[in-house]
């Protein structure tokens, strides 16, 4: 590998690490605020938003492990093994998020829970919409440049966080304006197809990676 290529790999890895460190820091803060405000407001989408932030922390930690375990000078086999494990971690977090949202949203619909209007939820979703798309795009671009399917998959989870921000804003906003108690859980459930599909796609990529390693 040429010196220029090595320096580029080092720079890309450094950028990826900083993106994941930022993801962890932002989502830890977001989770505390969202879950706390959601419990006070009785908001399924807001709590689910906070749990999603926590789950995204797990995904980001998995990517940090992958990046630190297999650096720019790692052997091909070592990098491949780390990439495969990171893909499985990201896939698991997608399914974990889908299961949680399903449980909480259906429970809210069956019990006809009416959340209080949550200004915190609206502000939080707006802030997240301002940050998450840019973060997701940066991860996606870096992952493709590195040839890391795990980082690209993690960027998709960050995109899901953006979608949930929009769903949260719609759900809480409709309740505040029109009093539609069901808008909150429906907004959360509307994200399920995207989340499950991305989880399945990531799991498929992990299996393909596994098969390639054993070919």
Question: Where is each model-derived feature located?
Answer:
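Alpha-helical transmembrane cores and adjacent cytosolic helix/loop segments
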Residues: 1-215
């Amino acid at each position: 590998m040429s010196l220029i290529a090595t320096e580029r790999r080092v720079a890309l890895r450094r950028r990826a690490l900083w993106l994941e460190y930022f993801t962890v820091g932002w989502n830890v803060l977001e989770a505390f605020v969202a879950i706390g405000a959601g419990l006070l407001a009785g908001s399924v989408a807001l709590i689910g938003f906070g749990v999603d932030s926590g789950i995204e922390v797990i995904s980001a930690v998995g990517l940090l492990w992958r990046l630190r375990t297999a650096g720019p000078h790692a052997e091909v086999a070592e990098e491949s093994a780390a990439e495969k494990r990171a893909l499985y971690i990201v896939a698991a977090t997608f399914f974990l998020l889908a299961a949680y949202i399903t449980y909480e949203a259906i429970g809210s619909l069956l019990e006809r829970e009416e959340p209080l209007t949550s200004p915190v939820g609206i502000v939080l979703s707006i802030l997240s919409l301002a940050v998450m798309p840019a973060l997701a795009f940066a991860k996606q671009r870096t992952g493709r440049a590195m040839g890391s399917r795990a980082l690209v998959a993690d960027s998709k989870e960050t995109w899901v966080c953006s979608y949930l921000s929009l769903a949260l804003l719609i759900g809480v906003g409709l309740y505040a304006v029109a009093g539609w108690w069901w808008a909150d859980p429906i907004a959360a459930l509307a994200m399920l197809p995207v989340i499950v599909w991305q989880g399945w796609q990531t799991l498929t990529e992990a299996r393909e990676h596994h098969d390639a390693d054993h070919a």
